[in-house]
């Protein structure tokens, strides 16, 4: 979702941008510290401009809060039985911090999550387009 916006992925940018724009006092949005490094790596690889990539991350941090990834989260991910470790870590962080939902375009990756998992469009329809 974040990469859709930062990299202006035209097929998904509008719905993903609406998710980020929804951040407010009523809706707090979080991203894990490990996801920030992944986003930086992917954006830098595509943009090939360190200063631009850093500025995009700075802009992102004005919108979302960063959640730590603890040893407990890593152990929970390892013990989760999930095939994709990165997704398991994200889910463990979200559960540990008692987040209400996970927003992703790849909802099937989180089919084993105890949390509500929704696409950007589902989130916008439920919480923004009232």
Range-by-range predicted roles:
Residues 1-31, 45-52, 112, 121-130:
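Short, well-structured N-terminal submotif of metal-dependent ribonuclease cores
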Residues 3, 37-39, 109-111:
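Short, active-site-adjacent cap segments at secondary-structure transitions
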Residues 10-13, 17, 34-74:
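Active-site-proximal, substrate-binding regions of enzyme catalytic domains
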Residues 25-26, 63, 80, 113:
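Structured helix-beta-strand junction loops
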Residues 30, 67, 118:
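General small-molecule cofactor/ligand-binding pocket signal
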Residues 32-33, 104:
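Short beta-strand segments at enzyme active-site cores
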Residues 63, 95-130:
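Acidic, PIN/NYN-like endoribonuclease modules and their adjacent C-terminal/linker elements
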Residues 65-107:
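Active-site neighborhoods of divalent-metal-dependent phosphate/nucleic-acid chemistry enzymes
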């Amino acid at each position: 979702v974040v990469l859709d916006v930062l990299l202006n992925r035209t097929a998904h940018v509008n719905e993903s941008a609406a998710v980020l724009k929804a951040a407010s006092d009523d809706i707090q949005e979080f991203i894990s510290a490990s996801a920030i490094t992944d986003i930086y790596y992917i954006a830098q690889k595509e943009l090939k401009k360190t200063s631009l990539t850093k500025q995009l991350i700075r802009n992102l941090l004005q919108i979302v809060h960063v959640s730590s990834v603890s040893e407990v989260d890593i152990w929970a991910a390892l013990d989760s039985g999930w095939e994709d470790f990165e997704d398991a870590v994200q889910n463990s962080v979200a559960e540990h911090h008692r987040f209400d939902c996970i927003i992703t375009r790849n909802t099937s990756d989180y089919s084993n999550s105890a949390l509500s998992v929704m696409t950007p469009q589902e989130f916008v329809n439920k919480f923004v387009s009232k």
